[in-house]
Amino acid sequence: MLLGFRRGRRSHFKHIIHGLLPAASVAPKAAVPRTPPPRSPNPSPERPRSALAAAILATTLTGRTVAIPQPRQRSRSESDVSSVEQDSFIEPYATTSQLRPRPNWQSEMGRRSSLPSFETLDYGDEEDIETQLSSSGKELGDVSAREDRGGHSDDLYAVPHRNQVPLLHEVNSEDDENISHQDGFPGSPPAPQRTQQKDGKHPVLNLKDEKPPLCEKPPPSPDITGRARQRYTEITREKFEALKEENMDLNNMNQSLTLELNTMKQAMKELQLKLKGMEKEKRKLKEAEKASSQEVAAPELLYLRKQAQELVDENDGLKMTVHRLNVELSRYQTKFRHLSKEESLNIEGLPSKGPIPPWLLDIKYLSPLLLAYEDMMKEKDELNATLKEEMRMFRMRVQEVVKENEELHQELNKSSAVTSEEWRQLQTQAKLVLEENKLLLEQLEIQQRKAKDSHQERLQEVSKLTKQLMLLEAKTHGQEKELAENREQLEILRAKCQELKTHSDGKIAVEVHKSIVNELKSQLQKEEEKERAEMEELMEKLTVLQAQKKSLLLEKNSLTEQNKALEAELERAQKINRKSQKKIEVLKKQVEKAMGNEMSAHQYLANLVGLAENITQERDSLMCLAKCLESEKDGVLNKVIKSNIRLGKLEEKVKGYKKQAALKLGDISHRLLEQQEDFAGKTAQYRQEMRHLHQVLKDKQEVLDQALQQNREMEGELEVIWESTFRENRRIRELLQDTLTRTGVQDNPRALVAPSLNGVSQADLLDGCDVCSYDLKSHAPTC
């Protein structure tokens, strides 16, 4: 039964290639250029090309994903071979349309998360990982077989950065397994295990040789376990009630945000209607002006307009490219790690002469794809190692329980003092305890499912809100552009109106013209003031929404961290409680045995003392009789001699009894000393375990510090990118100003320079908004 259960658990994680293929095929626009990279005519013989790098480069260039052929499997037993043959076989170099995922893979995709952030990945331990790879490659024969098949392992794109786990051969199992002794954190093995691996002695548990005694792990008493369960159930209920209250608060916040979004939509619709009315009025004015200004059409103005439109189009194209590059770079930097300095220096394959190609210098072209693949492989290996460790511990526990049951049955057979009624009562109590355990586990599973469902619903709502915010921002940008164009057209119309005034002095009266112009100016001022007020209100609402979005993201992250911490605390408390209960019961049994031994020794000594007193009384009585006989009858010497002989024999018997009592007392004292030594050894073991746990905590703290350093480096790179984009925008602005000033100096400079400057300032404002929104988006996940 144990082997079948283990094989069923292992079959879920056979092929991890299904989780990696969609990531390469989903990307809409790859960062790698379409043209293939230049190949050197004489490649170096030390570092041949990797099949993995070629496959990934082909997928990025053509868009057709290719399945990577599986490596040669290591030696397994018959049970593993049979389980592998039952699984599906992936043909080498098959497309993703031919690869259909299984339900097991779907369940695993549902369980696992996307990609870990910088806080959970320990990227700082790369040098330790490389040293472990070199040491484990010397010890294991299977790894050497893979290296012979794959060629040289020094290629950067072919060497995976995942931890290779040493093989530990179990004695009782039928097949070989990779067992990594990991305490809580899969990337940080403890120091004592490293010393054992260097000496060549792996920590193997011989299940047949080491038989724990009955007194080490007895079954827990029902009273203690019931009280502990009641306490834990009360604690968990309180925590879940607090989480429910927080969920209600978040739901209320989401409802208020939806109401505000609806109001924003209504305001945007009203603004669109007003803009449509303004456009209609402007069209009418344009038609009237065209009818009047057909005679005064100038080709220079048309040429300048074309140039300005071309510059605006080029500026928009550059903005879009910069935005896309920023988005792609932020996505890679949030999901994948950077190359270290040593890795970036050790990149070979560049031509020895001539300029260096740009597709090998930049981080965002090819290396992130390989690093992402290696990170996924690391995660899968760590998951396999943790599952194997859990299965080993489960097997050990089951075997211990079986041994304890066998010993208990033997004791029951030996001491048949237990009646059938007491045995039935014990069985009923055990059944009740098992039913209570099942009910509690079901309740915990239901609560965890509810928490997961609520978390997914919140994530969906947050994604919807972010999409709506993006749409609103895009609409506002479009409306701002339209407003800028309308203002430029209004200024052009004003200039034309002034020219028409000079031409048509005698046609229209000055007073009538002034009144019309004043009315138009007042209308324009009113409309501009209304638009400014509406724009200020919209900007204030957008800032409020962004602040609320940040607060919601922070609250969501805090809630997820609290849930994880609570789950970890529950597991730790349960483990500690189990261990303490087992230790208490073992100590109780040992104390009871010691008390029984002491009582038996006391009874034996009391019996010996009573015998000695009886013998002394008999001796005294005989001495009195002898004196009386000597005083009364001097002739009865023979009887006195016989009585003396009897007294000597009795004294010898008393001496023998005393010697036996002394020997038994020595045995009892020797046993007590042995028990004290056993207790001292156990205390030393517990102290070693405490030191080991302290060291593991130190390792985890170092990993967290390294993750924080990487986050700071990421922020520095983002600041550099922002400065570069700001400089490019400034350069484009200066070019626009120079071109517009050159072209506008000849005819009517005031009428042309002002609209161009207004357009540039508003474009700069749009650029600033884009950069601010990008900064918010890039810093939001890091928080």
UniProtKB/Swiss-Prot annotation:
Region (Disordered) residue spans: 28-49, 63-157, 176-226
Predominant location: cytoplasm
Phosphoserine modification, residue list: 50
Keyword tags: Cilium biogenesis/degradation, Coiled coil, Cytoplasm, Cytoskeleton, Mitochondrion, Phosphoprotein
Coiled-coil spans in chain: 234-333, 369-719
Keyword Coiled coil appears in the UniProt entry: yes
Subcellular location: Cytoplasm, Cytosol; Cytoplasm, Cytoskeleton, Microtubule organizing center, Centrosome; Cytoplasm, Cytoskeleton, Spindle pole; Cytoplasm, Cytoskeleton, Microtubule organizing center, Centrosome, Centriole
GO CC annotation: centriole; centrosome; ciliary basal body; ciliary transition fiber; cilium; cytosol; mitochondrial intermembrane space; motile cilium
Biased composition (Pro residues): 34-45
Polar residues: bias regions: 94-107
Domain of life: Eukaryota
Spans through the membrane: none
Biased composition (Basic and acidic residues): 139-155, 196-214
Alphabetical GO biological process terms: chemical synaptic transmission; cilium assembly; mitochondrial cytochrome c oxidase assembly; mitochondrion organization; non-motile cilium assembly
Role this protein plays: Required for ciliogenesis. Also plays a role in mitochondrial metabolism where it may modulate complex IV activity.
Disorder noted: Homozygous deletion comprising CEP89 and SLC7A9 genes has been reported in a patient with isolated complex IV deficiency, intellectual disability and multisystemic problems that include cystinuria, cataract, broad based walking pattern and deafness.
The protein's name: Centrosomal protein of 89 kDa
Organism expressing this protein natively: Homo sapiens (Human)
Gene transcribed to yield this protein: CEP89
